[in-house]
Each structure stands twice: as C-alpha cells, then as structure tokens.
C-alpha cells in the first residue's frame, strides 16, 4: 500500500500517513497549526511547527509508537505510547563483563527484571582496551615478523577464546575478528606509526568482541539477542579521533534502526559502547575513555526511554574515591549538573559528556553495582532536594599542569584573553580551570587530552613557546585539582570550612575557581598533598555533625549567615 501525503494549505507542515502493519483501523489525525492530537492513543499530543511532518507507525501486538519528524532540523522525537517494547538502557562496564563467569552473572541480573525490555550497552572485557593500546604501541617498533608475538595480543586472544569455550558458544563468532586484529598490528608494524585514526580502529576490537560473545551467550540460554556495532546503526560523530563528539543526526538514525528491527523481529539489542563513525571520513571513532556511558544515554534519549541504568563495580556515585579514603559512602541523589561536574573533574564513575543527552531528554540515570545489585545506588535527575545535603562529593584530578600567564599589556586591552585561548584552540588542548586578575591569568590543562609522556612534553613546550610571544609564562607541573561538588550557593561557609581544614594541614592553595553552574568549587594544590587534603575534607564535610547548620542558619539581607560556623580542629 502506498503512503498518502497531505499538505496543509495554511502552513508549510506536511503530513504523511504510512500504511500500518497490524492495526487496520488507524485513528484520524486531527490537524491544527501547533499541535497534533491522538485522542485514541491515551490522549497523547505532540507539539509541531512549520516544516514538520507527523507519522504514526504501529508496531507488533498492541504497541504503538508516535514519531514527530522535524524535516528542517533532521531530528526525530519518539514517544512510547504504551509500556511494551524497549523500556530502558542497561550499560555494563569492562569489569562487569571481564570473564565468562561475570558475563553469566550479568545475564542472570538482566533476567531478574522480567518487566524490562532493555537495550544492553557493553564495554570491552576488563583491561582489553589497555592491552590493545599497548599492543599498538609495541607494534610500531617491533617489526612485521614479530607482530604476531606481541604479549598483549596473546593475552587478548587467550582471554576471549577461553571465555567463548567456558560459555559453550561457537568460537567462529570471534575468530575472524582476532585474525583481523593480528593483521592490523602487522600493518602498524609495517608503517611504523600509530595514527589517531588507526588507534581508534584498533581499540574498537574490544567492544566488537565482547558484544558478539555476550549476544551469542544470551541466544544459547534462550534469550533472543541481536548484536549491533554502534558505528553501523547511526552513531555519527565529529572526526576528532580518540575524542569524537556525537552529532544530532545520531538520534533519529539510531531510533529508526533499533525500533525498525524490534518491530520486525524483537530481540534484545546488544550494542557496542564507546564507538562511532566520523561524519566526513566514515572511519571508526571513539568517544573518549568511559564513552560507553555516553553511548547509553544517547540511546536513551534517541528512544525516549523511561530510565538509563549504568552498572559499575561500585555502589553508585561515592562521596570520594574509595581508594583514597575507605570511608567514602554512596550518594543517593544527584542532579545532572552535579554528575557532569563530578565526571569532568575526575570521578571515574561516569563519562563527562554522558549527562547531556539524559538532561535534554529528562531521563533519570541510575548508577548501580553489578557486584551488589541490591544496593540502592545513585539516582541522577534534573533536580533534587537541596536541603538534604550541602556537598555531594569531593573529587581529585591528578597530573595537572598549571600555567601562570602575566602581561601588563593585558590591563584594559580588548581581546587579550581571546589571543591566549586561541593558542590552546590551535593546539587542540583543553583548559580545565581558569582564574583571572587585571594583569594575569592562571589556568590548568586537561591531562586526559595529552597522549603520552613524549607528547605531553612536546605540547607543553609548544604552548609555552607560543604564549611567551605575548606574555611572561610560568609553567608548574605536579599539581592536582580538588573539587567540592554540590550546593555551593553557600560558598562563603564552605570556603571558610575548607580553608580552615587546609590551613590546619599546612597546605597552600595555589588557585581557586568557582563554576558558573554554582555546583563546584575547585582548589589547586601540590599533587603530593592532594590525597591527605581529600581525606581531611571528607572528614570535615561528611563526618561532622554540624554540617546541617549550613542549611538552617538565619541569614542577613546580603545572604550571609548571622553567625559563623563552628569548626573543630
């Protein structure tokens, strides 16, 4: 049956009614210039505008999906009309699928939620990404004849072949990929270089292998599953290899592929995390370390799902890194802004960009522990009750380089800051924290954007060389950023307590910055002193009974408290 297209004479809106696969009595779509109402579909209404078209597509059984397609912007919003069909995303990290036994446990965990029909996003098996990178670096200098003998290649092969055998699945699902991996390493050895583009293709083998193994295992235990490579189902990124940004065209492409496959042949989608495809080159790209979280939230937004679950090896987001301080405790609630700041300033639980799709789609993110699924975890939403806690977490970012840039020409000069930051833009270096005065700028550089020890030094030398053309530059290595995340609108009292703690430890704060989002305050200190600072701050902010006084003290007209907070030595 051909589709019928009707154009409304009062606007540019075009409406397409597609033939329905199961429901013959399709409701008439009452058209207005601003909204389209679906009275028989649980009173669902979708706003539209000029240049929009509305399509109603029915799925299998009683399930319906409504799609509002914005033709001009090439974006698509999808709303579930009833509770059946794909319901949530479950993302599992590398430690959660590090062995055959762990994969069995993850499969059992998924089956404990029979009411859910999830999309599963997987990382590479534990330590595989690191081994792939090491193998690539060794291949550059080992020679073609020795590429097959690289230790990390043998470790990768042994792990995946052993896992396949223990899960009792056909080894052919991975053998082709292991052979292709070996040939790639020989190619790197022949060329004697590992470009960013090749590096991304190399590390993609980790997720491609883990998802194929897990999908095959689910099928052997009677759970119908289908494997997907993210770069083949519509994950479109910039061509910034090793750190691609997901483009808006990803959302309708991913939604169409996953929903179309589900409607024709329902099966649990098993999707590679971390990967995409460059929009110009068509080459495999990666989303940066921890990018599987971003894959999960992108799918959640694309499909308009009710929840995104990120399963880790810790009981949710913690008040600090438990390897620094063992008395760290789970944070029950976070806002998207707080979670984004936590991730950006060093918390390893989430990818820095992963909150953006969830925030835009207003989809809750639940961080859970795959080793301890009964733990409540952390729920991340748009807002939370700010009266429940002042701070949510203390984050440490190590290996930070600090730059002091001073110039009397900066005083009253228009465009000086633009010149400084254009240098970083040209060199592709990200800046973390910035503080300015009349004649100087202090800033820190993001270490995650610097590749190796050799490149770090080369890039830093180049930065200093360029900056010295316009200012006096002092480069300070071995620094760390300590960030206090939470409701920092009470910043004066938080600073009072924090500085008292650092003063009693004899620590000199070299720089301080407060984010415009009002959810973080950051201090720069010597890295050697950083862990002790985190421990002392945690004791003061999370283990002191008088912290709640910050919330209940009467305030003066300027917002200041009537009395200062008593701090124990």
Swiss-Prot record:
Task: Please summarize the record's notes on activators and inhibitors of this protein.
Answer: Inhibited by S-adenosyl-L-methionine (SAM) and lysine in a synergistic manner. No inhibition by threonine, leucine or SAM alone, and no activation or inhibition by alanine, cysteine, isoleucine, serine, valine, methionine, glutamine, asparagine, glutamic acid or arginine.
Q: In which pathway does it act?
A: Amino-acid biosynthesis; L-lysine biosynthesis via DAP pathway; (S)-tetrahydrodipicolinate from L-aspartate: step 1/4; Amino-acid biosynthesis; L-methionine biosynthesis via de novo pathway; L-homoserine from L-aspartate: step 1/3; Amino-acid biosynthesis; L-threonine biosynthesis; L-threonine from L-aspartate: step 1/5
Question: Which segment is the transit peptide?
Answer: 1-90
PANTHER family per UniProt:
ASPARTATE KINASE (PTHR21499), ASPARTOKINASE 1, CHLOROPLASTIC (PTHR21499:SF58)
| Protein location | Plastid, Chloroplast
Q: Which residues bind L-lysine?
A: 413, 415, 431-432, 437
Residues where substrate binds: 207
The name this protein goes by in its record: Aspartokinase 1, chloroplastic
Binding of ATP, residues: 91, 94, 123
Quick one: which residues bind S-adenosyl-L-methionine? Answer: 430, 452-453
* One protein family per Pfam: AA_kinase
Primary site of residence: plastid
Q: What else is known?
A: Only one ACT domain (ACT1) is implicated in effector binding.
**GO terms under biological process:** amino acid biosynthetic process; lysine biosynthetic process via diaminopimelate; threonine biosynthetic process
A cellular component term, taken from the record's GO annotations: chloroplast stroma
Q: Which gene encodes it?
A: AK1
The record's listing under PROSITE patterns reads: ACT, ASPARTOKINASE
Protein's UniProt keywords contain Transmembrane helix: no
- Origin organism is Arabidopsis thaliana (Mouse-ear cress)
């Amino acid at each position: 049956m051909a589709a019928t297209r009707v154009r409304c004479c009062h606007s540019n809106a075009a409406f397409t009614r597609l033939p329905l696969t199961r429901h013959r009595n399709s409701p008439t779509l009452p058209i207005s210039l601003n909204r389209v109402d679906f009275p028989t579909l649980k009173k669902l209404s979708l706003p539209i505008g000029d240049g929009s078209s509305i399509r109603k597509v029915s799925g299998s059984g009683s399930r319906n999906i409504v799609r509002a397609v914005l033709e001009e912007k090439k974006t698509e919003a999808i709303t579930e009309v009833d509770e059946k069909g794909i319901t949530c995303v479950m993302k599992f990290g590398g430690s959660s699928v590090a062995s055959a036994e762990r994969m069995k446990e993850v499969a059992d965990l998924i089956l404990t939620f029979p009411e859910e029909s999830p999309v599963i996003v997987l990382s590479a098996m534990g330590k595989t990404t690191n081994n792939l990178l090491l193998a690539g670096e060794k291949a550059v200098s080992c020679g073609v004849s020795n590429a097959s003998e690289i230790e990390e290649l043998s470790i990768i092969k042994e792990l995946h072949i052993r896992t396949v055998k223990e899960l009792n699945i056909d080894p052919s699902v991975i053998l082709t990929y292991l052979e292709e991996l070996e040939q790639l390493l020989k190619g790197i050895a022949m060329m004697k270089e590992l470009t960013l583009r090749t590096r991304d293709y190399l590390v993609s083998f980790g997720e491609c292998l883990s998802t194929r193994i897990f999908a095959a295992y689910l099928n052997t235990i009677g759970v119908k599953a289908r494997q997907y490579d993210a770069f083949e189902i519509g994950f479109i990124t910039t061509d910034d290899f090793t750190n691609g940004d997901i483009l808006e065209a990803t959302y309708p492409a991913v939604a169409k592929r996953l929903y179309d496959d589900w409607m024709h042949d329902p099966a649990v989608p098993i999707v590679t995390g971390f990967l995409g495809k460059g929009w110009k080159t068509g080459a495999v790209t990666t989303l940066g370390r921890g990018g599987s979280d971003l894959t999960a939230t992108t799918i959640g937004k694309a499909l308009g799902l009710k929840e995104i679950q990120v399963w880790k090896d810790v009981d949710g987001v913690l008040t600090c890194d438990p390897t620094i301080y063992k008395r760290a405790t789970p944070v029950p609630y976070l806002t998207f802004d707080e979670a984004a700041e936590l991730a950006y300033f060093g918390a390893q639980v989430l990818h820095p960009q992963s909150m953006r799709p969830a925030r835009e789609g207003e989809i809750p993110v639940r961080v859970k522990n795959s080793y301890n699924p009964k733990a409540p975890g952390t729920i991340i939403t748009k807002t939370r009750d700010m009266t429940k806690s002042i701070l949510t977490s203390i984050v440490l970012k190590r290996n930070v380089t600090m730059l002091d840039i001073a110039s009397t020409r900066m005083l009253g000069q228009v465009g000086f800051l633009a010149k400084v930051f254009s240098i970083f833009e040209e060199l592709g270096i990200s800046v973390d924290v910035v503080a300015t005065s009349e004649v100087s700028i202090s800033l820190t550089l993001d270490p995650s954007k610097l590749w190796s020890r050799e490149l770090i030094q080369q890039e830093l030398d180049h930065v200093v060389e360029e900056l010295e053309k316009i200012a006096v530059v002092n480069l300070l290595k071995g620094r760390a950023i300590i960030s206090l995340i939470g409701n920092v609108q009470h910043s004066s009292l938080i600073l009072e307590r924090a500085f008292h703690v650092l003063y009693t430890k004899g620590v000199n704060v070299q720089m301080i910055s407060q984010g415009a989002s009002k959810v973080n305050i950051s201090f720069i200190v010597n890295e050697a002193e950083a862990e002790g600072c985190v421990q002392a701050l945690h004791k003061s902010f999370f283990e002191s009974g008088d912290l709640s006084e910050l919330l209940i003290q009467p305030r003066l007209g300027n917002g200041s408290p009537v009395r200062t907070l008593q701090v124990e030595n």
